[in-house]
A protein has these predicted regions:
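Transmembrane helix-boundary elements of multi-pass transport/secretion proteins
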Residues: 1-64, 73-93, 103-114, 141-144, ...
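Hydrophobic alpha-helical transmembrane segments of polytopic membrane proteins
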Residues: 113-136, 154-157, 208-216
Length: 226
């Protein structure tokens, strides 16, 4: 299910936009919408799956039993992060294959970079999910982090209103959120045939956010549940 849902949603979007008029010389509505989905959907899905799964591991006692061994907290988080990241990579790969080779998604830049950014966004979702799971006591609380952590990023990253048109104080908040840079990197790939310095900077920033989130998750991981 985790592999198929993004591709099914993108396919549904393809048929939704099939009859929508396209301006000459401009990207099609499907191209614009699909790029956004390829960027934000892996972030959302992997955040939910990671935070809920880690909370379930804690409640069942599996995580505590593992931590009774000499295994370090950072090693445990790295193992979980690697496992979730592999699932994220498989999800992003299938979604990109369906989008580019079956549904005809067109971008000025290479599809490879769209694929890379989609994976980076998914890994960011894993990192944020691992971090938030450390503060949740139940699976319901883990789900409640979704509107707190993810929703503001979707509202302020430029999907609804361009970031340049936001009030100054909202632009400052937007500049501190990783999804803003993830979407900007995808927009750069969609608009330019070569990878721009802005896209490289944005990808590096998103990777940095993911690494910091995983590091903080390791620091907050407790060996015993209160």
């Amino acid at each position: 299910m985790i592999l198929l849902v993004p591709s099914l949603i993108i396919t549904l979007m393809y048929f939704m936009f099939a009859e929508v008029p396209q301006r000459p010389g401009a990207p099609s509505p499907f191209d614009n919408a699909c790029l956004i989905i390829l960027g934000v959907f892996p972030l959302i899905v992997m955040f939910l799956i990671t935070s809920i799964t880690m909370q379930r591991e804690r409640v069942s006692g599996t995580r505590e039993r593992i931590l009774t061994t000499p295994l370090r907290r950072l090693d445990l988080l790295a193992a979980y992060g690697t496992a979730f990241s592999i699932a994220a990579a498989a999800q992003a790969t299938l979604a990109c294959v369906v989008s580019f080779w079956f549904l005809g998604l067109n971008t000025a830049g290479s599809p490879v970079w769209v694929f890379v950014i989609a994976i980076v966004n998914a890994v960011l979702g894993v990192g944020l999910g691992l971090l938030c799971s450390a503060f949740a006591r139940t699976e319901f609380q883990a789900v409640q982090f979704m509107p707190l952590v993810i929703a503001p990023q979707l509202l302020l990253c430029g999907i609804i209103v361009p970031r340049a048109l936001l009030p100054d104080w909202l632009q400052w908040i937007s500049n501190a959120l990783p999804a803003s840079y993830a979407l900007e990197a995808l927009q750069q790939v969609g608009a330019y045939p070569e990878l721009t310095s802005v896209a490289v900077r944005d990808i590096a920033i998103v990777v940095g956010f993911a690494v910091v989130a995983m590091g903080l998750a390791a620091a907050t991981l407790r060996r015993r549940t209160p």
